[in-house]
């Protein structure tokens, strides 16, 4: 739509994002692929090409706080990047697999995406985790795997501290560490300078992870009010992956499974709404990677579900932002109607 060196202004109803933007700002001035200024409607410079989008908002690119680079998705890493960028995602926290594919993707896609990789999760042998990590039988083996992750360039360590939801029996499957083991693992990782993100379902597993120093809880199904209060007090991130749970309905094996899933999702959404009201930082993560959770579109569905759970539109967008909208930074912007992406601006250029 525009020449790269021409000064251009993108104007909408408002600019939503962390950084220099204030509530009365509704336009972003771009030159040479960089944000020159964030403006109000009455302060447009002369000789500027203007693109108007009434009824829309301008937002930063998104960060997906939980996904996997999975071979089962049927896409190359470049294809995954294409899908993510088309949905306005240029930053992602990669949640691990058995072979550490995210570490390779981080290197190969460094010029396109900012990927923070866990490499592979750490899980207790005999419990859930073989598809997303490597099993350990004791603390010493866990420390050895953690050292391997650090050497390979992992940005954080993912610890699997529960199983997954089984809708047929309405229970959380076996998985996780003993409390003492989990405490030692988290302390070891933190001493090495990395955060710990815990896969945890069931309020006891979530509470242990938060008590012992986890930086983030992934999933958190069946979390109690008391544990939500603890999450708020300790300023732990909560990544509820609502869309991932909801997507399981298409795979329900029976009417009983479907009913249990619907009730579980309803309860999880209620917990997310309470978490936000308590001041918990609820972050959007798609859990994309499996074929039934597509890259990009499932993240956008997650945003809608977070708002449906009771988080205001602007708070959802701010939490989803990969970075602030600031002067002199690269002009990566989204033109949104609700959460629907109408245009993507990458390095000051409208993508076709």
Model regions and ranges:
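N-terminal metal-binding scaffold of metallo-dependent hydrolase/deaminase domains
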Residues: 1-44, 349-350
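Divalent metal-coordination and catalytic microenvironments
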Residues: 13, 28, 33, 55, ...
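Active-site core of metal-dependent hydrolases
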Residues: 168-270, 283, 288-290, 308-311, ...
